[in-house]
Amino acid sequence: MNLISIPAFQDNYIWLLANRQKHCVIVDPGESAPVLATLAQGQYVPQAILLTHHHNDHVGGVADLRHHFPDIPVYGPQETAKKGATVIVNDGDSLTIAGQNYTIIAVPGHTLGHIAYYSSPYLFCGDTLFSAGCGRLLEGTPEQMYASIQRLAQLPDETLICCAHEYTLSNLKFAHAILPADQDIATYQQQIEQLRSKNLPSLPVKLQFERKINVFLRCNDIDLQRKIETTSPPDSLVSVFCELRSRKDSF
């Protein structure tokens, strides 16, 4: 499989996953122009569009893409029904597109109907889980978002996180501010600074590594709890998550 990240807007990524026959899926096309350019350059043949949630920077290019490819199915959660989705999918549903199997995972939090698409090893998770971070709570509750990222964290180690924004460096700066002595975070921040200075993407990233450098996946870490002056018992880890999210919102 060939995975391509297509930059869009200021910091979005539209994902394209193609097989050997150059049949591909397009994930969260916020705008159409860069997608059409990539399709033409690589001679890819789109088989489907996958939407994770209803925000315009993820669905804005759907109408024009459907103009160019009238028969293309557009999969998405119920909240995308008015944003171009032609096939509504729900948690636990399975899709087979261009010979690749996809499982739908409900991940409410950023929006109430947000979903992710998992096709081993690829995880298209929209604005739920970012490298070294997670999405803002624009509609859901902290409990929902914490449960969602924990659900994604249970996927296999080799899972490749294909999120929709280039937020890695800013997320690492926040993580370093919380855990300045953490060598994994400090080293990775330096690596990403060099990568981004060359305008190269920081994604995708393996879930196994993400568990080390993403503070939102480390809410049970005693050192982390001490740093944010939280002494939550194991059944209150959502309060640790909530405190981290609150601090990140104002960072």
From Swiss-Prot:
Record-level Gene Ontology MF annotations: hydroxyacylglutathione hydrolase activity; metal ion binding
Named cofactor requirement(s): Zn(2+)
Pathway(s) it belongs to: Secondary metabolite metabolism; methylglyoxal degradation; (R)-lactate from methylglyoxal: step 2/2
UniProt xrefs under Gene3D superfamilies: Ribonuclease Z/Hydroxyacylglutathione hydrolase-like
A Pfam family it matches: Lactamase_B
Domain of life (superkingdom): Bacteria
Alphabetically ordered keywords of this record: Hydrolase, Metal-binding, Zinc
Binding site for Zn(2+) 1: H53, H55, H110, D127
Cofactor binding, note field: Binds 2 Zn(2+) ions per subunit.
GO terms (BP aspect): methylglyoxal catabolic process to D-lactate via S-lactoyl-glutathione
EC number, as in UniProt: 3.1.2.6
Residues involved in Zn(2+) 2 binding: D57, H58, D127, H165
Reaction(s) this enzyme catalyzes, per UniProt: an S-(2-hydroxyacyl)glutathione + H2O = a 2-hydroxy carboxylate + glutathione + H(+)
Keyword hit for Hydrolase: yes
Function: Thiolesterase that catalyzes the hydrolysis of S-D-lactoyl-glutathione to form glutathione and D-lactic acid.
Family matches, as PANTHER family: HYDROXYACYLGLUTATHIONE HYDROLASE (PTHR43705), HYDROXYACYLGLUTATHIONE HYDROLASE GLOB (PTHR43705:SF1)
Subunit structure: Monomer.
UniProt cross-references to NCBIfam families, sorted A to Z: GSH_gloB (TIGR03413)
Protein family per UniProt: Belongs to the metallo-beta-lactamase superfamily. Glyoxalase II family.
Record protein name field: Hydroxyacylglutathione hydrolase
Lineage summary: Bacteria, Pseudomonadati, Pseudomonadota, Gammaproteobacteria, Enterobacterales
